[in-house]
Amino acid sequence: EANSFDIFLLVLLAAIWGSSFFNIKIATDSYEPITLALVRVIFASIPLILLCKYKKIKIEAFSKEWKSYSLIGLCNIAIPFTLIAIGTGQINSYLAAMLMSTTPLSGTILAHIFTKNEKMNLGKVIGILIGFTGILFLFLDKVIINEKNYIFALITILGSTFYSIGGILTLRIKNKGNENVTTSTTIWSLIFLIPFSIILEKPWLMNPSIESTLSLLYLGIIATGLAWLIRFRILSINGLVFQTQVAYLIPIFGVILGYIFLKEIITIKVLIALIAVIIGFYFVRRSIKQNLTSV
C-alpha cells in the first residue's frame, strides 16, 4: 500500500519528466540534438554506476549478453533521446509531452505482436482507440500542428515508439536486474552517441547561451540522473504497476509547465486530446491490472 511519501515521489517524478520537454525546447536553441542526448546520458550514467557500485551490483554491459544491452541502449535511449530533441525543438513542448504519452499505447500493440502473455483484450483495444483518437484530434488543430511542423510531431511519435521497442527488447533480459540493465544499456548508448556527436555536430564549435546550458544541465542532472534514481526507488518499494501511473501525470505537467514558462497556446482541442489520452491509458492500465490479478 503506497503511503503519502510514495505518492509524493510519484508526483515529483511526473513533474520532473513533464518539465523535461520545455527544457529540451530551450536547450535546442543552442545545442544540436545528438549532443543534447549525449550530455543527458553522461549525467545519467554517473549516479547509475555509483548506485551499482554501492549496492555491489555487477555491471554486465560487456558480458556475453552485450548484443542485447547494446541493442536496447540504441533503441531505448540513444535513438529516442535524439528523435525527441529533434521533434521538440520545432513543436510546442506540451505537444511533445502529449505525443510521448502514446508510449504505453504503442507498447501495448507491440507487446501483443511480440510477446506470448500480453495479448490484446477488449479493454486494451478501447484504451488504444480512445488514446490515439485524441492524438489524431491534435493533428486537426492547425494552431498547434500545421504543414510546417507536422513532420516534427511525427518524429516525436517515432521517438515514443522506439521507447516501446526498447521495452519489448528489455523483456529478453528481464531477469538480469533493473539497475544492471539500465546501467549497461546506458553505457552502450554512450558508445553510440559519442562518435555521432563528434562527427556530425562538432559540439566544441557550439556557442551556447546561458539559458540553454542551464536547461541542458537540468535535463542531465535532474530529469535523467535524479529521475532514474527516483524511479528505481518507486520500483523497489511499490512495484511496476504503481510506477506506471506516472504516465497519467506527465502530459498534464507538460501542458501546465509549457503554458507557464513558454507561454504556449493551449486550445480547446488540446485539452480534449489530453483528456482522451489519459482516459485511453486508464483503460489500458486497468486491463493489465485485471490480467495480473486473475493470474
Label the predicted regions:
Residues G18, I49, G73-A78, T82, ...:
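Hydrophobic/small/kink-forming positions within alpha-helical transmembrane segments
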Residues L48, S70, S101-T102, L110, ...:
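Hydrophobic transmembrane alpha-helices of multi-pass small-molecule transport proteins
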Residues I16, S20-F21, I49-M100, F137, ...:
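Specific transmembrane alpha-helical segments of multi-pass solute transporters/efflux pumps
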Residues A37-V39, I77, F81, A96-T102, ...:
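Helix-helix packing/entry segments at the starts of transmembrane helices
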Residues A27, L36, R40, G87, ...:
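Hydrophobic/aromatic residues within transmembrane alpha-helices
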Residues S19, N23-I26, S30, A44-F62, ...:
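Membrane-interface helix-cap regions at the ends of transmembrane helices
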Residues E1-T35, I86, I145-R172, I191, ...:
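Glycine-/small-residue-enriched transmembrane alpha-helix faces in small-molecule transporters
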Residues L48, G107-I109, I113-F114, I145-E201, ...:
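Transmembrane alpha-helical segments that form core, pore/gating elements
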